[in-house]
Regions:
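Catalytic cores of nucleotide-sugar-dependent glycosyltransferases that transfer UDP/GDP/TDP-activated
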Residues: 2-271
Length: 271
């Protein structure tokens, strides 16, 4: 088997766009390609026992206690303290792969008196400098934390309302899994493991656990963010329902471990 970390990525690498010159070979052997999504350590990433948070919470107390964590996040990062603002997080290596050119394009359009953005990460200087520029331009509503700090990451997941993962490509991705665990609604591009783990919100059936867009275009990311903002501000009950669905989603290694076991059992010679 050629094991990949998501079903969609296992398919994507058989295309010319993602195959890096091996697409034809991989298509020939496609019956040996298997996608198994990663899980996260649900002991480390557990909002009910997380000592780094201002207030721990489970799905029953999330709606109330995420507001406490939002206030603590705003205070610690120098943002205007206002529980009514929508806080959008971005926790990422600041590189081209992560879709940051799209983010740069849409920031001026999404920043308003109701919205705050928090960026955590390091990487290419062009992105570091652009986010610093935005922090200065949107004082009190934009934070560029140009470093990687695990404690701050925990507090962003707990304090933000939504998390951006607009990657150009993403074999699996873990940030969207952690976000859901912490009740932060993911806004993702439909690629690799992001497509496999985030089901788009359906307003008619009140289902799904995030907001998605398909083609790698800033206009589509902008639309996805605006759909999220519209639901957040105009239908909080449905938003809160999605937060609870996300927290109840199994993002542990349990299911993946069983798939690995089944794979290896299948490879074991029979007597």
């Amino acid at each position: 088997y050629k094991r990949q970390v998501s079903n969609t990525y296992a398919w994507e690498i058989q295309t010319e766009e993602y195959g890096e010159g091996l697409a034809e070979h991989l298509r020939y052997h496609n019956n040996k390609i298997l996608g198994i999504v990663n899980g996260i350590d649900t002991d480390i990433w557990n909002p009910a026992t997380d000592k780094l948070l201002a207030a721990d919470y489970d799905e029953k107390s999330a709606i109330k206690n995420k507001k406490i964590n939002k206030k603590a996040l705003q205070e610690s990062l120098g943002l205007d303290v206002d529980e009514h603002k929508m806080v959008i997080g971005l926790i990422s290596r600041l590189t081209n792969q992560k879709g940051l050119d799209l983010v740069n394009d849409v920031i001026p359009g999404i920043m308003d008196e109701h919205t705050q953005v928090v960026v955590l990460g390091t990487g290419d200087s062009q992105y570091e400098n652009t986010f610093r520029y935005y922090e200065n331009k949107y004082k009190g509503n934009f934070c560029a934390y140009i470093a990687y700090n695990e404690n701050v990451a925990h507090n962003i997941y707990a304090g933000c309302d939504a998390l951006l993962v607009p990657s150009r490509f993403e074999p699996c991705g873990l940030t969207q899994l952690i976000a859901m665990r912490y009740g932060a609604v993911p806004i993702v591009r439909e690629t690799g493991g992001l497509k496999d783990t985030v089901q788009p919100y359906n307003m008619f059936e009140n289902t799904g656990n995030g907001f998605t867009f398909d083609r790698y275009e800033s206009g589509l990311l902008y639309d996805a963010i605006n759909r999220a903002k519209t639901l957040y501000f105009e239908n909080r009950k449905s938003w809160d329902d999605m937060v609870i669905r996300d927290m109840n989603k199994d993002v542990s290694w349990e299911k993946s471990a069983k798939q690995y076991k089944d794979m290896y059992v299948g490879l074991t010679p029979r007597d």
